[in-house]
């Protein structure tokens, strides 16, 4: 795909995105025009909200089948579209007694929904939509949904909640957190013990991390290739927080192969 324009749709409740800086980052690295637009979900009508609600996941072990949403789910989605800050008040994974308490969406179904809404369907334009909704995809290998930070292709989705929740924390963190919970204790002391080892909500490191996901999306749409196997590359699809921070913060560059591809784009 030969790109001429990239449209970024902001998520204003996450100031760490730094959308203007991202636009400059893209223009510094690629010969494309960049347009910034408001939150994609802000002005959906009732019919569109209902369609979006159909992408919700209520059972992580059941592959998504679009359903007729209940009124309370549609009402929630309508309020969320008007004010995405509501998402921050929903149950987080670490606080959930049951995973069904967490608000989740099928990433591919949401992508289909977004594609149907976008009026600008020119082939040389890439749309990247930020959201604090948690996107997930179904993994056939273990027959369940898993959180995802990014859904590539076009339109692409970057889930800020997915960036926090999808890459796993260390095994030590989970063992200690489970031990605390078994004693009826919170996990704040465990989080403090491991502070800096993983991203947290509204983490100042998000801006740098998001640059890497932007690169992954653009490279996928240019080359058709998914991610990079090397940890020393910003295109690496990190499954652990430590690997994410290593690739995006410590290394913060592309491998030789992908740097050569980037150089040809300028």
Outline where the language-model segments fall.
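Metalloprotease/metallohydrolase-associated module, dominated by Zn2+-dependent proteases
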Residues: 7-16, 146-204, 222-266
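N-terminal low-structure segments adjacent to metalloprotease catalytic domains
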Residues: 1-148, 262-266
């Amino acid at each position: 795909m030969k790109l001429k324009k990239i449209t970024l749709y902001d998520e204003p409740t996450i100031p760490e995105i730094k959308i203007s800086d991202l636009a400059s980052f893209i223009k510094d690295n690629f010969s494309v025009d960049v347009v910034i637009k408001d939150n994609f979900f802000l002005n959906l009508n009732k019919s569109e909200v209902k369609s979006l609600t159909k992408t919700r996941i209520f059972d992580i072990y059941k592959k998504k089948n679009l359903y007729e949403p209940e009124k309370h789910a549609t009402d929630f989605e309508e309020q969320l579209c008007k004010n995405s800050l509501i998402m921050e008040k929903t149950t987080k994974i670490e606080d959930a007694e049951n995973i069904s308490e967490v608000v989740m969406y099928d990433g591919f179904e949401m992508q289909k929904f977004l594609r149907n809404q976008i009026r600008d369907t020119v082939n040389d334009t890439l749309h990247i939509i930020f959201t604090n909704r948690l996107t997930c995809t179904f993994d056939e290998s273990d027959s369940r949904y898993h959180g995802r930070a990014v859904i590539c292709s076009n339109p692409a989705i970057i889930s800020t909640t997915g960036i926090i929740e999808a890459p796993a924390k260390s095994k030590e963190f989970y063992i200690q957190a489970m031990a605390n919970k078994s004693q009826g204790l919170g996990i704040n002391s465990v989080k403090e013990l491991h502070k800096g080892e993983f991203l947290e909500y509204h983490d100042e490191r998000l801006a740098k991390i998001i640059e890497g996901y932007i690169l992954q999306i653009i490279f996928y749409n240019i080359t058709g290739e998914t991610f990079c196997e090397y940890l020393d590359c910003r295109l690496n699809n990190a499954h652990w927080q430590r690997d994410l921070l290593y690739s995006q913060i410590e290394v913060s560059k592309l491998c030789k192969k992908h740097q050569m591809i980037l150089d040809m784009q300028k």
